[in-house]
Amino acid sequence: MDSIVTRNVARSKDWLSNQVFPLWFEKGIHAGDGGFVEALSLRGEILDLPRRAMVQARQIYAFRTGMDMGCFPEARTRAVVARAAAFLIERYSAPSGAFFHSIPSASKPGNEQPDLYTQAFALFGLANAYAAAPEASIKRRALALVDYLRRERRAPGGGYTELEDGRFVLRSNPHMHLFEAAIAWLRADEDPRWKELAAEILDLCLTKFVDPETGALCERFAGDWTPERTDGRFVFEPGHHYEWSWLITLHAESRGLDATQVPLRLYRIAEARGVSPGGDAYDEVWSDGVPKKKSSRFWPQGERTKSAARLGAHAPDGEKPGFARSADMALESLSRYLQTPEPGLWRDTLLENGQFREEPVKASSLYHIINAIEEYAALRPGLTSSR
């Protein structure tokens, strides 16, 4: 194995095993109810914030993945995941079959809106809980959520409506996470309803989200699924280009499909237009290639890491070194966000001036970070040297 790769994998796994999971097991789980806390301060203090359903779902995934990577003990993981899944179902469920956005903290109100983004992650969290312990009650709750979406949230032109400020809108990103949830369920359960959901969202992506003229993937849409434009341009996010390219490739692998053209195009657009001269993926870019928001959150760096690694695994031998270089560059970029005074924490946003924004450490972020490390460790050794 390349010495750079060996070092990167060892350093990343050591950080997870000896810094992240000890801290988040001690402080990231509510002592009273077994649910996950929303965030810690940069000093590792628990913050009094409403707790989102998304956090419960993502942390179920993160702890389960930590177990699979050998970074957290199996017995502890199974207990944590089972308790968190029960908490998610008991505290966030609405009579309709939906999940609430958040529950209140000691001093701040929660939010009972059933936004689509929350529904996608609730479905994802339940899939990971089911994979850890396949209980019929978890699957029943997940299918009740799918029934709710199809009964109450269908959009006329396909897909599902999102809620923003009390109004229904159309967005691609929640659908991406529904696709992710369907894939997670397919890996744990062969019920054809998961295959149907995945196929539905993939078709929507290929026919509605990806602009046929530019090849870029739009984020926000009018009611007929036409992109929302400003002066003829729409906004795309390089991080979501990487994320979609990874998900489509992952799904194609598992189902024996041939789907390399769209993922490669999304990836290449992000590489060409969405990465700063310093090697960090931008937050937002106009569809004509002009950067709109030159800040760089941590998660696009993680998505670039795993997209480069997985697409590189399918590339011809002569192209593998390019994917290897991008994976190494992206993981190195991500690693800068993980250098904090208190071990086991992370930064969120690198501003255009090169400084990190001072802000709480969101528990939800670990989902992106550990997924990137897992994919890099599994796939990057199979690519040729990046040197």
What are these regions (language model features)?
Residues 1-387:
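Glycan-recognition and catalytic cores of secretory/periplasmic carbohydrate-active enzymes
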